[in-house]
Amino acid sequence: MADTTGRIPLWIIGTVTGITVIGLIGIFFYGSYSGLGSSL
């Protein structure tokens, strides 16, 4: 692994980013399905 001193490990950034993106997409589709996002 590369030197991660003083930096956040890249795999943590990737994991958090992936979960955030999936969460936002899930909320968007859930809102659209519920009719809450139909006005966006």
Curated annotation (Swiss-Prot):
It holds the Pfam family PsbJ. The chain crosses the membrane at residues 8-28. It comes from Glycine max (Soybean). Its main location: plastid. HAMAP family: PSII_PsbJ. This is Photosystem II reaction center protein J. PSII is composed of 1 copy each of membrane proteins PsbA, PsbB, PsbC, PsbD, PsbE, PsbF, PsbH, PsbI, PsbJ, PsbK, PsbL, PsbM, PsbT, PsbX, PsbY, PsbZ, Psb30/Ycf12, at least 3 peripheral proteins of the oxygen-evolving complex and a large number of cofactors. It forms dimeric complexes. Belongs to the PsbJ family.
